[in-house]
Amino acid sequence: MEMAYIQAENLKHKRTFTKTLMVLAPFVTALMNFFAPLWFQLNSYNWWYILLYPGFLTLTCALVEQRDNGKLKYRAVASLPISQNKVWKAKIGVAGIYSCVGNFIFLALNLLGGFAILVINEIPLTIGIGQAVAGTVCIVIASLWEIPLCLWLSKKVGIFVAVILNAGLGSVLGIFTATTSLWMICPYSWVPHLMISVLGILPNGEPVADRIAAMSFWMILLVLVISLVWFAV
């Protein structure tokens, strides 16, 4: 039954900007960095998880939520003999799927760009395939908790304010706490802090010189489990 709700929610966004955004955001990120071949992969990932992805995720959630909110204010959905709770969960599910798709499109573009630079400029990959996959999975899972929050923000304060609060203030907060002892208690810093260990990239875009501070596998796993639990709650 829940799958039927998700399928119905997905159909609402057929031929809309919401689905275009899944391709546009990763493509723009890759294109912006392709002409700096030496740092293409590192810069692309840094721009993605620090700037473009938070905006993409927040805007996607807001567009998913506003599809029923808008002018009708959920009146069309409320008049149907369906569970409103399941409709909301379907919105969370669809936004999560779009987030995954966008991230793995970015992963593909990052690796394709890396191999193209290897062939054209003979510059080796700075992020390997396994490392890129692990980094992308961490980005997806560690940011899942933002989806219900962004949907709620969009419903309460609208798209513009939701983007300002989550993609703007939230991202800035995450950047400043990611390299401090407060990173664990600030969910916005989870993704940038994980990238220090998984991809070897600091929030300012510089490669990590000292890997001693890198987290262990179990610490990385703990952060991902906490994010999943918080998302499920």
Where are the model-predicted features located?
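Helix-capping/transition residues at the boundaries of transmembrane alpha-helices
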Residues: 12, 77-79, 154
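Helix-loop-helix units of permease transmembrane domains in multi-pass membrane transporters
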Residues: 64-97
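Residue-level recognition of transmembrane alpha-helices
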Residues: 23-26, 91-92, 166-167
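Terminal transmembrane helical anchor/hairpin motif
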Residues: 39-40, 163, 167-233
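Aromatic- and glycine-rich beta-strand/loop motifs that create alpha-glucan
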Residues: 1-23
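Secretory targeting signals
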Residues: 26-57, 93-159, 209-218
